Amino acid sequence: MKQKSLIDDLHDIQEEEEKNYLPLNKMIKAAKTTGISEAKVYGVSTFYTMFSVYPRGKHIIRVCRNLSCHLSDAEKIVEKLKEILNVDFGETTKDGEFTLEESSCLGMCSVAPAMTIDDEPFGNLVPENISEILRKIKEDSKK
C-alpha cells in the first residue's frame, strides 16, 4: 500500500513541476509524508522511466529501440527526431518544449516503429511525418 501511495505522490509532484521532474527537496518531503526512507524514494524515482530527477521539457518523446522497432527502421525515426529537435537522447530542446528519451519497448510491436509523446502512442512512423506530429503536439499544447 505504501509503495502505491509513494508512486501516486511522485506522479503528483512531477505533474506540478514546470520542468516535469522530481526535485530533491520534494522527494525528501514525499519520504516524510509516506514514512518511506529517502533512499527508497530516490530508488523508486530513478527506477521507473516515467520519473526523472532531472529537469525535462514540457513534452516527453520516448522512442522504442527494441528489436521489432529496430528491424522496422526505428533508427531513421531517431535520426529525424534528432535532426529536427537538435538534441540527443536525454536532452531537452532549447525552447524547453521537448525532451527525447529512448525506451526498450513500448508494447507497440505490431505498429513498429513506434514512439510516444506524453504517453500518446504513435505507430507505423515514417521520417516524413515526424515534423507534422511535433508541430501538432506543440500547437495543441498552446490551446
Q: How should each PLM-predicted stretch be described?
A:
Residues 1-143:
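Signature of N-terminal electron-transfer/Fe-S-associated modules in redox systems
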